[in-house]
């Protein structure tokens, strides 16, 4: 049997089993891999809810769901490093979930919220954002271990998605009728600009050298639960 290791992090105790040694060979215990992949699945689920909420016209809740996905996206990698459960499968699964959460979900939010009033042009603008997110994620995948981790090449897809979500919230508070407003074209331009920033060659500081231990894991989970409560209120 493997040796049990107890690791305490920000007040949370994790118990992880080391690799078992059977007939002189180490057998990796796969249970710990479920934790980060489960968090990734929750991020994907939140993105799926955002898509359905956008289609039903619940734009504020759809935007909140994108915020939840962004928080969970930061938590899965953190959990993987903490549990030493990083894997190629987890990286690919996370990337596919990010495409839904930060590519499709914000694009559909922008379209149903405002761009639909521009007809095919609005649909094209939403597609540009989604396509740029796909390009950005693909480029990020092949640059892992190649570029300086302190910087992103192009705006990170979660941040671009949050720009769409937060601007939607602001415009909802202003109670603008996009069916009769000239601001619709500006929102379309804004959507395209956010997309193009993702595929630009501009370097953005990644904050990956920031001490994330200052933000306890339980605080992030509390933020997620609070947003979930607002969505289902």
Q: What does each model-found stretch correspond to?
A:
Residues 1-24, 149-233:
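C-terminal membrane-associated helical module and adjoining short loops/tails
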Residues 4, 15-44, 79-99, 138-159, ...:
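Interhelical loop and helix-boundary elements at the membrane-water interface
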Residues 23-26, 30-40, 56, 60, ...:
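Membrane-water interface of alpha-helical transmembrane segments
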Residues 33-40, 82-137, 167:
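Multi-pass membrane catalytic core of lipid/isoprenoid biosynthesis enzymes
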Residues 39-42, 62-66, 125-132, 160, ...:
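Hydrophobic alpha-helical transmembrane segments of polytopic
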Residues 49-64, 100, 104-124, 167-186, ...:
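Helix-coil boundary and interhelical linker segments in multi-pass alpha-helical membrane proteins
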């Amino acid at each position: 049997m493997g040796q049990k290791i107890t690791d305490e992090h920000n007040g949370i105790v994790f118990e992880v089993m080391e690799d078992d040694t059977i007939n002189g060979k180490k057998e990796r215990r796969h249970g710990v891999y479920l934790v980060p992949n489960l968090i990734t699945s929750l991020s994907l689920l939140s993105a799926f809810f955002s898509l359905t909420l956008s289609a039903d016209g619940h734009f504020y809740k759809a935007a909140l769901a994108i915020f939840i996905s962004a928080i969970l996206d930061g938590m899965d990698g953190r959990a993987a490093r903490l549990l030493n459960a990083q894997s190629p499968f987890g990286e690919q699964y996370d990337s596919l979930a990010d495409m839904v959460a930060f590519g499709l979900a914000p694009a559909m939010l922008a379209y149903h919220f405002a761009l639909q009033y521009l007809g095919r042009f609005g649909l094209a603008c939403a597609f540009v954002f989604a396509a740029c997110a796909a390009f950005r994620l693909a480029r990020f995948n092949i640059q892992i271990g190649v570029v300086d981790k302190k910087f992103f090449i192009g705006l990170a897809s979660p941040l671009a998605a949050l720009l769409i979500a937060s601007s939607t919230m602001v415009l909802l508070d202003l109670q603008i009728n996009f069916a009769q407003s000239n601001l619709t074209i500006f929102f379309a331009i804004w959507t395209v600009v956010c997309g193009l920033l993702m595929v630009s060659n501009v370097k953005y500081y990644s904050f990956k050298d920031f001490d994330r231990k200052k933000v306890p894991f339980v605080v992030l989970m509390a933020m997620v639960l609070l947003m979930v409560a607002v969505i289902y209120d």
